[in-house]
Amino acid sequence: MARTHLLFLLFVLLSLATSSTSTKEQEEDRIKALPGQPKVGFSQFSGYVTVNESHGRSLFYWLTESSSHSPHTKPLLLWLNGGPGCSSIAYGASEEIGPFRISKTGCNLYLNNFSWNTEANLLFLESPVGVGFSYTNTSSDFEESGDERTAQENLIFLISWMSRFPQYRYRDFYIVGESYAGHYVPQLAQKIHEYNNAYKNPVINLKGFMVGNPEMDKNNDRLGTITYWWSHAMISDASYNRILKNCDFTADRFSKECDSAIYVAAADFGDIDQYSIYTPKCVPPQDQTNQTKFEQMMQMHTTKRFLEDQYDPCTENYAEIYYNRPEVQRAMHANHTAIPYKWTACSDSVFNNWNWRDSDNSMLPIYKELIAAGLRIWVYSGDTDSVIPVTATRYSLGKLNLRVKTRWYPWYSGNQVGGRTEVYEGLTFVTVRGAGHEVPFFQPQSALILLRSFLAGNELSRSY
């Protein structure tokens, strides 16, 4: 095991030594302007970084530098989405924290008033290979995807990328992600921590990480999810009790009786967006043909009410139109190998791949290690997500047995309660009121306030 780790570090070192540090390579990745983009004052870069030469594995990135007057003083923030198999460009960049939003036609971009690039230089990475524009020349690689290889190749990417962008070496660096990135983020942070301990003067100045609605611990995630369904009146008492009777949440695999109980309970939900249980789900025009006039009218009324608050449940569809446009791909230096499939928000080759090689049951041992290492760690949870709900996260965090520094209190976003928070020794937990699975998408102002407090290392405001 030690020899394997040493060989990996030597490979990373070789990658660093052979990567070009020339301005030319960086300039080749510069985006002059994206199709339909409003005029902006910040720089953008995108392109590929090879993470495995022999197999032809390359990861695609998009850097949007800070819009502040002094981007060179702002930290670098890497954003990762989960799945596994979902694109950080589709979700993180285009729906959540990036500087642009995509119009309904997929033709134009408009500014996100709550973009996180006011506070940091944002690096979006499509990982692992097979996600978005990231690719491999070896088809069998899809059968070898897993947590360990993803973490290793994300580290290789970062070191090689920093040789292309040397101005970000030693810059304060943070990793943020959501959902299954609850695995990716702490696992990458652990790899960086190990790498930094192995070398003098390491180039990645990791300060901390933050995860939202994260997968943390399989047993507690399962129990917390069922509890949320029942406590939020999504399932009946009978369904809840049937699940408790037939399901062993500590088992590696559920029994047939448990699967059946969960299947029956899911029918209690109705046709809702499970990632945001109180907002309307996306209903594309072609799906409205079987609706009555009254149903169509009510759908339009409900959607209009939420759109006035800048919420649109169909934004994922607009991204798939925009990023498949040839002129957009040319502007982003993407798909230069003519990948034989369309760009999608979530990749079938990864998302539907039952051959995902390894997925740790619990991230809690990594949390304990990195808390002891002194990293800044925040965990936040949108309280209307039923897929990885706040109850699951609270159960998981409870297993860490951390000492409470600042007891539970409401924090404010403007003149409204933004959520609640509790501060522990080595970790801060935050709920975001009225937010679903993608917190910055549903509550952009609150999410930006959350980011500012995280980067500053300050507790969230108790008053407005």
From Swiss-Prot:
One of its GO terms (cellular component) is extracellular region. It is an enzyme of class 3 (hydrolase). Glycans are attached at N52, N113, N137, N290, N335. It holds the Pfam family Peptidase_S10. Its main location: secreted. Disulfide bonds join C86-C346, C247-C258, C282-C314. Its EC number is 3.4.16.-. Residues 1-22 form the signal peptide. It comes from the Eukaryota. Expression not detected. Keywords: Carboxypeptidase, Disulfide bond, Glycoprotein, Hydrolase, Protease, Secreted, Signal. PANTHER family: SERINE CARBOXYPEPTIDASE-LIKE 22-RELATED, SERINE PROTEASE FAMILY S10 SERINE CARBOXYPEPTIDASE. Belongs to the peptidase S10 family. This is Serine carboxypeptidase-like 22. The lineage of its organism: Eukaryota, Viridiplantae, Streptophyta, Embryophyta, Tracheophyta.
